[in-house]
């Protein structure tokens, strides 16, 4: 019985070490749009889906340069839900220096990074060609999914 307990304790310790190493190896990508609750949220959601499907060590977050709401518009919640993503509990937050300082990539979508969130060593790119989701969810979705797939291809090649 004692040996069994020792084996279980050893396995538990190894699993937690592996989990910590796996978490440390995950690279963060930050998507930033003006309000942080539409384009950046869609991009982060599609990015996380595709990274998981490909088994890649990346995780994305959504931030806003000037969030003005605490919720996500219902059409966006519904559209992402149809794509298998639940954002019903998501609350937009403003991008901060802590978000971008260690990010593998920062992607601005139709906005600028606030001065207090700029980081010297951060790889920043702009996606200014994404159509408004309020005009056409499908067009925004297609544009973002294409950008996300291309970004993941580039990140895995680096």
Regions found by a protein language model. Name each.
Residues 5-15:
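Bacterial N-terminal signal peptides
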Residues 21-95:
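Conserved active-site segments centered on acidic
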Residues 56-58, 104, 122:
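A structural micro-motif
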Residues 100-101:
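A short, aliphatic-rich alpha-helical micro-motif
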Residues 111, 115-158:
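Phosphate-binding/catalytic loops
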């Amino acid at each position: 019985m004692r040996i069994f307990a020792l084996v279980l304790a050893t396995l538990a310790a190894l699993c937690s070490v592996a989990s910590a190493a796996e978490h440390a190896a995950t690279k963060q990508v930050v998507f930033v749009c003006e309000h942080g609750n539409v384009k950046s949220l869609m991009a982060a959601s599609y990015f996380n889906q595709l990274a998981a499907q490909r088994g890649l060590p990346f995780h994305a977050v959504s931030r806003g340069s000037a969030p003005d709401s605490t919720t996500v518009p219902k059409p966006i919640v519904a559209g992402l839900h149809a794509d298998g993503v639940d954002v019903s509990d998501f609350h937009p937050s403003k991008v901060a220096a802590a978000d971008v300082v260690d990010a593998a990539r920062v992607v601005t979508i139709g906005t600028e990074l606030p001065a207090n969130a700029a980081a010297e060593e951060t790889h920043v790119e702009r996606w200014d060609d994404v159509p408004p989701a309020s005009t056409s969810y499908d067009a925004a979705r297609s544009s973002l999914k294409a950008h996300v797939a291309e970004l993941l291809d580039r990140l895995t090649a680096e």
